[in-house]
């Protein structure tokens, strides 16, 4: 079964259909890396650095809200129509490690997934080339210092 986002996994579990093979939130080595990274158009980032940093700040503050107040975040998701059921939204927010963005190394995450994609034959470039040509950690590093909790 492919990756499923809420509410499908909860519905399947409630009906006792299938079983979890890999839970990237808890199973090593996957759990030691970010599941998602934010991407931006290089030209936009270059010409609009203030807006870029604001977007990233908003995403990181939203992650903090999900980590510290999953009940409030789940209610907002349901009230805004992004999630149909509060209990499923709350369960998802409570199970995912939203608070790890300060601890995990984004560059290490890129390296890890680039290696996996290369091993599987999906990409030809090595991790170092992808990191050198396609990443810019300045905004994240600045916000890690700025948003220390």
Language-model features and meaning:
Residues 10, 28-29, 83, 93, ...:
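Short secondary-structure capping/turn micro-motifs that flank functional sites
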Residues 2, 20, 85, 125-126:
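A local structural micro-motif
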Residues 30, 35, 42, 90, ...:
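Generic secondary-structure boundary/loop-capping signal
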Residues 7, 25, 90, 130-131:
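Residue-level "edge-of-site" marker
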Residues 46-125:
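Secondary-structure end/capping motifs
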Residues 117-149:
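Conserved C-terminal helix/tail region of periplasmic/extracytoplasmic solute-binding proteins
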Residues 1-79:
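Pocket-lining segment of extracytoplasmic ligand-binding domains
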Residues 23-27, 40-45, 107-110, 142-149:
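Short, structured secondary-structure boundary patches
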């Amino acid at each position: 079964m492919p990756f499923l986002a809420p509410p499908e996994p909860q519905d399947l579990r409630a009906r006792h259909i299938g079983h979890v093979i890999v839970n990237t939130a808890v199973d090593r080595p996957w759990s030691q890396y970010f599941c998602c990274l934010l991407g931006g158009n290089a030209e936009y980032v270059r010409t609009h650095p203030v807006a870029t940093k604001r977007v990233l700040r908003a995403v990181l503050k939203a992650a903090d809200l999900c980590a510290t107040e999953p009940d409030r975040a789940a209610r907002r998701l349901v009230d805004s129509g992004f999630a149909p059921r509060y209990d499923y939204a709350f369960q998802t927010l409570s199970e995912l490690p939203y608070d790890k963005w300060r601890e995990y190394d984004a560059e290490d995450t890129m390296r890890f997934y680039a290696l996996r994609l290369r091993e599987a034959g999906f990409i030809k470039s090595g991790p170092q080339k992808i990191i050198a040509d396609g990443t810019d950690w300045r905004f994240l590093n600045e916000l890690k210092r700025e948003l220390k909790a």
